[in-house]
Structures are given as structure tokens and as C-alpha cells.
């Protein structure tokens, strides 16, 4: 039933979140790592804590034991353990709380889960104040560069960042197709009773075709052939399972009338590419949504930078009613960074014009950067020009608190 973790020794790309995970383990009785399926949660935790025993609660026999005899199950783990997919047995959390409270020490249990909201609710009821929570997304650009995978922009927009694709050299079209089918068959069923699978599949593909756009649930639902309340429910399912992400609009103290609707992105740009029908790297360059996919990759790279350091999202976008827009505002304790994405490999000097106007409207803006599809860092008078691959390192310089 149970695997001794000492036998687990995968070849692993070191994840940027590892130091934070290890530090928090010494400060809390529990650390909970959540994130998409196949983002590397199990590999991360088992490699970080090789001396902890491991149990996968998705295995039917393990789950049955934990559900029917929780005290007997936990008796095997008096000194702590890694429990994978803890949301499958939410009632176990109350028993874990008692066991950890009786032990009275930090560094006991590491929990993983891939259902964002259900897991948060369960933890809030049983482990409030006792667990640190980390979110692990697929590889960042820097992590991808540690593999032998291509980091050319079009290759990345096609293949995405799921570790399994790059660790095991799986054809992205096959891997992402399998991921999507497994998601529909397993996760969607556990999260919601969706009767019309055909409409739901259409809905997901429509969402992928709208990355980087303002979210309009009425239009999205109409195109999918469902009501607005149904579209809202289905989008919440995509968010709960780490498929889709809503970037909030900036609502600071400015005199302009601002757009309030969020923008829609996918946690993995490769999955979005797959769902809009891209089947090879060569199709990316001429695809009409290439710019939106590049913007998606930029936003996720900034989000991964935060989450990999144990920080919450500090991201928003700016758009006023007259169309003045900035793709991404990144707030820090020392001011805000305004970022614009330009997927072309050649930098156009007028790219800073809109950023300058946004900086004039948003007094907190201290730095401006254009993230583009080229490969050269350029320090300009008005700001910095960055390749996508350099964004994380540059944010590290700008955000001293991260």
C-alpha cells in the first residue's frame, strides 16, 4: 500500500520553489503544495523530503483505508509523511490536525492537491494557522532552460511548460491531448456534474481562443450555447482545476474611467495553443493569436516568479474607457512596474509610448519594460527591453522583496 520515500530518486530539474518549501516545512506543522496536475508537485515534495514516507490518496486501496479507518491509517505515520492529492479524502484533515497538535512540533506533514478551491475550503476548516500554502505551476522559463528543451519563442508557445513533456521528451500534441482528455474524464467529473460534455469542450476551446481578452461571460456563454450562469459556473471549474486564470483590472486612485472586467489567461500556454488547433511549432509564427499567446506566456512568467517565492499574485492590467492599455502591472513595495508584450523579434521604439501614458495616469509606476520576441536585453532611456527568457531575472532585480 505504501511506498518508502527513500526508494524514490527521480532525475529532477531543481525547482525554484524548493528553498521556500524547505524553509516553511521547518516553520509549520504542515505545508500544502497545490497546483495543476502534472506541474511536478509529487516529484518536488518527494525529492525535497526523501526521508518522509509517501502515500498517494488517489490509489483506491490507500484511499479506502484512509476513509474507513483514519486513525489506523495515520498510526503508520506518527512521525509525518507526504500525502498526495489530499482533497480526495478531505475528512482526513481533521484527524491530521489532532495528530499534529498532539505532537506539538513543526515539520510533520507535506500535503499536495490539484483542486484549488475545494482544497482551500477544506484546509480553512481544519488546518487554519497550521499550514503554509504554496502553489506550484509548470516550469518557469528559467527552469525550462535547465532541460535540453528548446527555448525558442515559437517552440515554447507550442509546447508549453508542463515538466512531463520536457523531462520525458513527449510530443506536445500527444501529451497535451492526453492531458485534456484526462482532465475532462476525471477532474471535471469530480468538480461538477456537467451533463453536456460536448458544450463544455466547446466552452474550453472558446476560452483558449480568448486568452488576453476582456472576459465577457455573456458572449462566451452565447458562443458555447449555454446561459451566462452556466458559463460562470464552468469558468469556476476551469479556475478550480488550474486551467484558466483571471487577471484583475487595476482599480487604483486615478481620475480616468477604468475597465472593470478581468482578462482571461491559461495557466499553460501550450494547452491554450493545443486547444485552438495548433499542432506544430511551424504553425505558431503565422497564427492570428500568436501575440495573445505570447502575452499569456509573459503574464504567467510574472505569476510564476511570485508564486515560486511563496508570494501571492500582485498582478493586474490597466485599461481605461478610451482604450489606453498596459498588459501587466506588477506591484512592489517600492512602486509598480508597467510591462507591455510585443511578440515580434524586432523592437519598435514607439512601444514605450503607451507605457509612458499609463505611467502618467498611474502615479505608482516606477519602471517600464517591453517584453518582446527577440533575444537581446536593451537598456533604453525610457525603460528596458527584455526577451521573455530574461523577465524572471529582471523582476528579481526590480522586486527586492521577492
Regions found by a protein language model. Give the residues of each.
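Hydrophobic positions on the alpha1 helix immediately C-terminal to the Walker A/P-loop
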Residues: 44
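Pre-Walker A adenine-sensing motif
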Residues: 11-24
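Conserved lysine of the Walker
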Residues: 41
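Domain-level recognition of nuclease-like catalytic cores that cleave nucleotide substrates
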Residues: 148, 373-402
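Short regulatory helix/loop adjacent to the ATP-binding pocket of P-loop NTPases
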Residues: 117-132, 149
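Conserved catalytic/switch belt of AAA+ P-loop NTPases
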Residues: 93-111
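Accessory nucleic acid-recognition modules appended to NTPase machines
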Residues: 170-336
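Hydrophobic anchor at the beta1->P-loop junction of P-loop NTPases
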Residues: 33
Amino acid at each position: 500500500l505504501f511506498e518508502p520515500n527513500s526508494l524514490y530518486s527521480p532525475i529532477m530539474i531543481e525547482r525554484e520553489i524548493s528553498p521556500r518549501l524547505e524553509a516553511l516545512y521547518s516553520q509549520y506543522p504542515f505545508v500544502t503544495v497545490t497546483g495543476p496536475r502534472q506541474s511536478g508537485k509529487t516529484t518536488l515534495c518527494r525529492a525535497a523530503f526523501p526521508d518522509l514516507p509517501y502515500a498517494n490518496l488517489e490509489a483506491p486501496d490507500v484511499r479506502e483505508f484512509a476513509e474507513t479507518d483514519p486513525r489506523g491509517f495515520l498510526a503508520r505515520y506518527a512521525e509525518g509523511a507526504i500525502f498526495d492529492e489530499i482533497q480526495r479524502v478531505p475528512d482526513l484533515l481533521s484527524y491530521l490536525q489532532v495528530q499534529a497538535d498532539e505532537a506539538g512540533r513543526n515539520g510533520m506533514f507535506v500535503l499536495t492537491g490539484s483542486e484549488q478551491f475545494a482544497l482551500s475550503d477544506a484546509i480553512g476548516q481544519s488546518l487554519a494557522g497550521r499550514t503554509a500554502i504554496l502553489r506550484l505551476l509548470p516550469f518557469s522559463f528559467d527552469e525550462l532552460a535547465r532541460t535540453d528543451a528548446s527555448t525558442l519563442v515559437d517552440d515554447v508557445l507550442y509546447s508549453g511548460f508542463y515538466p512531463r513533456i520536457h523531462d520525458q521528451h513527449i510530443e506536445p500534441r500527444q501529451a497535451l491531448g492526453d492531458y485534456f482528455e484526462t482532465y475532462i474524464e476525471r477532474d471535471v467529473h469530480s468538480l461538477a456534474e456537467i451533463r453536456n460534455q460536448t458544450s463544455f469542450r466547446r466552452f474550453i476551446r472558446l476560452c483558449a481562443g480568448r486568452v488576453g481578452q476582456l472576459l465577457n461571460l455573456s458572449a462566451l456563454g452565447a458562443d458555447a450555447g449555454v446561459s451566462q450562469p452556466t458559463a460562470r459556473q464552468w469558468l469556476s471549474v476551469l479556475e478550480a482545476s488550474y486551467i484558466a486564470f483571471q487577471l484583475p483590472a487595476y482599480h487604483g486612485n486615478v481620475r480616468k474611467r477604468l475597465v472593470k472586467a478581468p482578462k482571461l489567461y491559461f495557466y499553460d500556454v501550450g494547452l491554450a495553443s493545443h486547444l485552438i488547433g495548433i499542432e506544430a511549432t511551424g504553425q505558431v509564427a503565422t497564427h492570428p493569436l500568436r501575440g495573445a499567446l505570447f502575452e499569456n506566456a509573459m503574464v504567467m512568467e510574472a505569476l510564476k516568479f511570485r508564486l515560486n517565492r511563496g508570494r501571492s499574485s500582485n498582478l493586474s492590467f490597466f485599461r481605461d474607457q478610451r482604450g489606453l492599455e498596459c498588459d501587466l502591472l506588477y506591484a512592489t513595495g517600492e512602486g509598480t512596474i508597467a510591462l507591455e508584450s510585443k511578440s515580434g523579434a524586432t523592437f519598435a521604439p514607439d512601444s514605450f509610448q503607451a507605457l509612458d501614458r499609463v505611467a502618467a495616469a498611474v502615479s505608482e509606476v516606477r519602471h517600464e519594460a517591453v517584453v518582446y520576441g527577440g533575444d537581446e536585453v536593451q537598456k533604453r532611456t525610457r525603460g528596458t527591453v527584455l526577451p521573455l527568457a530574461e523577465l524572471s531575472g529582471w523582476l528579481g532585480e526590480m522586486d527586492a522583496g521577492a
